[in-house]
UniProtKB/Swiss-Prot annotation:
Protein name as catalogued: UPF0756 membrane protein BBR47_32760
GO cellular component terms given for this protein: plasma membrane
Source organism: Brevibacillus brevis (strain 47 / JCM 6285 / NBRC 100599)
Transmembrane segments: 3-23, 48-68, 85-105, 106-126, 128-148
InterPro entries reported for this sequence: UPF0756_TM
Entry annotated with the keyword Mitochondrion: no
Length: 149
């Protein structure tokens, strides 16, 4: 067994121990692809996987609107409640951070592994919630801009 498979198995174990289904499923799929000699598709996943994942996530977030569970009058209430206005501002800031995270992750794949391990450790040992490496990368990019290179 090669080192990459061993590392993936360790990540799979951490995902299972940490009760992180997203990481567990993703790593299991990658391991399965390696076992079935489907590595030729890895460049395609590297190039388009993040964008495809964001599209699927966005569809999931917008489904309540499309299904009618969120009615149009709710949008007017956003501008009459300071909690909702703050939610809009925080949403904008997090989207900004995610954009910075996307750039950082594409420029330095090693950071992705560190963020993934940190997320798994946070879920496993601190009862955290996996908010995703993308936002973590955005926060890291935000912090790094203030530190010497």
């Amino acid at each position: 067994m090669d080192w990459i498979s061993i590392i993936l198995l360790v990540l799979l174990a951490l995902g299972v121990i940490g009760n992180n289904a997203t990481v567990s499923i993703a790593v299991a799929i990658l391991l399965l692809m390696r076992l079935l000699s489907l590595e030729r598709y890895f460049p395609l996943l590297e190039q388009h996987g993040l964008q495809l994942g964001i599209i699927i996530l966005t569809i999931g977030i917008m489904t309540p609107l499309a299904s009618g569970k969120i009615n149009p009058s709710s949008f007017l209430e956003i501008f009459t409640n300071w909690h909702s206005l703050l939610a809009v501002a925080v949403g904008m800031f997090v989207a900004y951070l995610a954009g910075k995270g996307t750039v950082l992750m594409s420029q330095n794949p090693l950071i992705v592994t560190g963020l993934l391990l940190g997320t798994i450790a946070g879920v496993t040992f601190f009862r955290g919630v996996a908010v995703g490496p993308l936002i973590a990368a955005g926060i890291l990019a935000f912090i790094l801009q203030f530190l010497p290179k």
